[in-house]
Design a protein with these regions (language model features):
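N-terminal targeting or signal-anchor segments and their processing/structural boundaries
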Residues: 1-264
């Protein structure tokens, strides 16, 4: 799902989040100065009344707020994709995403870090291709696939081709742990939580200093002409809530080359 954000004149902003996205920063943002997070408040109501659809009046009575305050709370949750708010009926319908977000907070289910911020000038943030139903996403500087493993993507020209089931393609740079890669036609598989990298122009990596293993140095000679696969974490561990020390795993699919005669 995605939502637009107002920006300066001629600038267009949009935020696109996975339905399984979770972050502690967003949790704190939703809570603000309240003593109890509004997500918990809504869940307390649905637990008490055993229903996911209710009116503003019913909710206001339960939380002991006036109807204007209750409506503002519900509308904010609707803007963030946790409920559907029907203004003509003054009725809220709770989405599964609200319950999943609470479970993610308590580490009871897996979640992901897929969140894209699009900022464009003179072009659309998102374009739907009606022939294949893929989304062309523009104006994306960087985004994160894994906070724990520090896997960050910087797409070339800010462009991503989003496909079914949160799979996507891009050209650009990949930072993964101690590796940095630059490639073309990179393919992300959401279910496998991996990147297929058929055309990697170069790979640089960091190693521990022999005299001080707390510090790193980049190997100056890049490995070139790679075809490889990056497995970010186990498919059922996208949040890295289980500590699996072997990830991320980078596997070369063919012979590669190191050119020692390059001066740069």
């Amino acid at each position: 799902e995605f939502r637009a954000i107002k920006g300066p004149k001629r600038d267009a902003f949009a935020v696109i989040e996975s339905n399984n996205y979770f972050s502690d920063d967003k949790w704190r943002e939703l809570q603000g100065i309240e003593s109890v997070n509004p997500l918990y408040v809504v869940k307390q109501f649905t637990d008490a009344y055993k229903k996911d659809e209710f009116t503003v009046k019913q909710f206001a009575k339960f939380v002991k707020l006036d109807e204007v305050q209750a409506k503002m709370m519900l509308m904010n949750l609707a803007l963030n994709g946790f409920i559907i708010y029907e203004s003509y009926r003054e009725t809220a319908i709770v989405k599964q995403k609200l319950y999943d977000y609470i479970l993610s907070k308590t580490k009871k289910i897996d979640y992901d870090a897929l969140r894209f911020i699009s900022a464009t000038k003179g072009e659309a943030n998102i374009v739907l291709n009606t022939s294949d139903m893929n989304l062309q996403m523009n104006g994306i500087k960087t985004f994160t696939l894994s906070d724990t493993h520090n896997v960050v993507i910087r797409p070339k020209n800010g462009a991503i081709r989003m496909q079914k089931n949160r799979n996507f393609e891009f050209d650009g740079d990949i930072m993964a742990g101690l590796f940095t890669l630059s490639g073309m036609n990179c393919k992300f598989s959401y279910d496998n939580f991996s990147l297929e990298l058929p055309t990697v122009d170069s790979l640089n990596f960091f190693v521990h200093l022999f005299e001080d293993t707390t510090k790193f140095v980049m190997i100056q000679t890049p490995i070139q002409n790679l075809q490889c696969k990056l497995i970010i974490d186990a498919p059922d561990n996208k949040s890295s809530r289980k500590k699996l020390p072997d990830y991320p795993i980078l596997s070369s699919m063919k012979d590669s080359y190191v050119y020692y005669d390059q001066t740069n």
